[in-house]
Amino acid sequence: MLLRVAWRRASLAATSVALRRSSVPTRGLRLRVVDHAPHSAVPSEAEAVLRPLYMDVRATTPLDPRVLDAMLPYLVNYYGNPHSRTHAYGWESEAAMERARQQVASLIGADPREIIFTSGATESNNIAIKGVARFYRSRKKHLVTTQTEHKCVLDSCRSLEAEGFRVTYLPVQKSGIIDLKELEAAIQPDTSLVSVMTVNNEIGVKQPIAEIGQICSSRKLYFHTDAAQAVGKIPLDVNDMKIDLMSISGHKLYGPKGVGAIYIRRRPRVRVEALQSGGGQERGMRSGTVPTPLVVGLGAACELAQQEMEYDHKRISKLAERLIQKIMKNLPDVVMNGDPKQHYPGCINLSFAYVEGESLLMALKDVALSSGSACTSASLEPSYVLRAIGTDEDLAHSSIRFGIGRFTTEEEVDYTVQKCIHHVKRLREMSPLWEMVQDGIDLKSIKWTQH
C-alpha cells in the first residue's frame, strides 16, 4: 500500500510545476505535453493546463501509466503478428497475447481458454446476445433482458426481434434493481438467454448477479452479463456466480481503448455463432489479427486491478461519500438516483430539482461531467434509465453523473462540489419555478395550459 501511495504522490509531484499557474486543482493524473508542430492535434502546454479536471470516469478512464509502460515494447520493438508461427517475431507476440489472456482470466476466476479478445464491450455484447440466440434459434426463440441495459444490448435485442425472436424487457424497481420473481416469471420453455448488466453505467446500481446466475442455472438456460462497469472494480467470479458469458471493456478499467474481451464458458459448453468470417482467430469466435499492444494493455490493466481493487474501492468510497454529503448538506431538493446501498460508489447520479441539467453542465465548464451515458448523452431526451426507475421528466432532465476513479483526488472532489453548489444556487435564483416553491406554492397543484 505504501508503494502505491508513493507512486501516486510521485505522479502528482511530477506534474505540479506545470499546473501552478492554473486555478483548477491539480489532477490525479496528467501527461506531460512535449513541443509539437503548430497544426498538430496534440494540445499545447498552455491548452493542457486550461483543460477542465476530469470527473467522467464512467465514460472512460485515463490510461494507467503502468499500462502504457507494458504496452510500449509491443508498439516499438515486438511488432510481430501473433498468428505468425514460423519465426521469433510471431512467437514473441503470441506469448505476450497468451499472458494477457491469463491476466484477464485470473481477474474473473476463468480459464484462459474461455477468454476471447474483442474490440470492446459493444462487440462482446453483440457476440454474446446474437451469437447464442442464432445458434439455438431452431428450438429457442426467446430472450430476457432489462429496460436499463446499455444501448448496445437493447439494440442487439431489437435487431433479433426483426429476425423473428421474442424479447422480454424486464422493468426495474424504483431502486433500479430487478425483481427476481418477475425474472422467474418471464422465463419461458424456449428461452435461450438472460442478459442483465452487473453495474449500471448511468446510476451505478449493482444487480444481484449471483442470484440471477442461480436462477438461470436451475432453469438450464444461459446467463450473460455486461460487466464493463464492474470488472476490476468489484470482486467477480464467473464460477461462483454461475455466469456463462461476460463482456469486458479495456478503457473502463484504466486500459487502452479499442480492446475488450468476452468470457464464454467451456464446461458445460456454451455454443455461440460467430458474427464475422475470416482467418478463424480466437477459436473462430472473432476472426482478425489480434492487436498485441492493446491486449497486452488490457492484461496489464486487469492485473493491476486485481492487485489494487480493495485499495481503490475503499478510497473511491470515501471520496464518493465526501461528495454526496457536502452537496446534500449545502443544497436542498437534491435526489440521488438508484439504490444507495446496492451501488458502486464511483458512479453517482444526482438530480438537482429546478435546474436544467444541460445548463448546469455548461456552467460547470471547469469540470468534465456528463448527464448520463456517453453513448446517448448527445440526445436531448431524458435518460431512459431514469425514466425506467420512475423518475419524473423534470428531475430526469436535471440529472448529472459524477465519476470518481483511481486518479481522482480529494482536492478535485472539493473543487467540483464548490462549483456545483455555486452554480445550482445561481441557476435556481433565475428559475421562476424555484421562486414559486420558495413562496410555498405546490407546483403539482397548478394546472398548466399551452399557448
Swiss-Prot record:
Record-level Gene Ontology MF annotations: cysteine desulfurase activity; iron-sulfur cluster binding; metal ion binding; protein homodimerization activity; pyridoxal phosphate binding
SUPFAM superfamilies: PLP-dependent transferases (SSF53383)
Modification Cysteine persulfide, positions: 375
The entry's keywords: Cytoplasm, Cytoskeleton, Iron, Iron-sulfur, Metal-binding, Mitochondrion, Molybdenum cofactor biosynthesis, Nucleus, Pyridoxal phosphate, Transferase, Transit peptide, Zinc
UniProt xrefs under PANTHER family: CYSTEINE DESULFURASE (PTHR11601:SF34), CYSTEINE DESULFURYLASE FAMILY MEMBER (PTHR11601)
One GO CC annotation: cytoplasm
Enzyme class of the recorded protein, top EC level: transferase
Post-translational modification comment from the UniProt entry: N-gluconoylated.
InterPro entries documented for this protein: Aminotrans_V_dom (IPR000192), Aminotrans_V_PyrdxlP_BS (IPR020578), Cys_deSase_IscS (IPR010240), Cysteine_dSase (IPR016454), PyrdxlP-dep_Trfase (IPR015424), PyrdxlP-dep_Trfase_major (IPR015421), PyrdxlP-dep_Trfase_small (IPR015422)
Positions annotated as active site in the UniProt record: 375 (cysteine persulfide intermediate)
Name of the protein: Cysteine desulfurase
Cofactor: pyridoxal 5'-phosphate
One of the Pfam families matching this protein, by short name: Aminotran_5
Keyword Plastid set for record: no
Domain of life per record: Eukaryota
Keyword match Cell inner membrane: no
Family indicated by similarity: Belongs to the class-V pyridoxal-phosphate-dependent aminotransferase family. NifS/IscS subfamily.
Residues holding pyridoxal 5'-phosphate: 121-122, 229, 249, 251, 289
Binding site for [2Fe-2S] cluster: 375
Residues with the N6-(pyridoxal phosphate)lysine modification: 252
Species of provenance: Rattus norvegicus (Rat)
Residues binding Zn(2+): 375
One GO BP annotation of this record: Mo-molybdopterin cofactor biosynthetic process
EC number: 2.8.1.7
Summary of activators and inhibitors of this protein: Active only in complex with LYRM4.
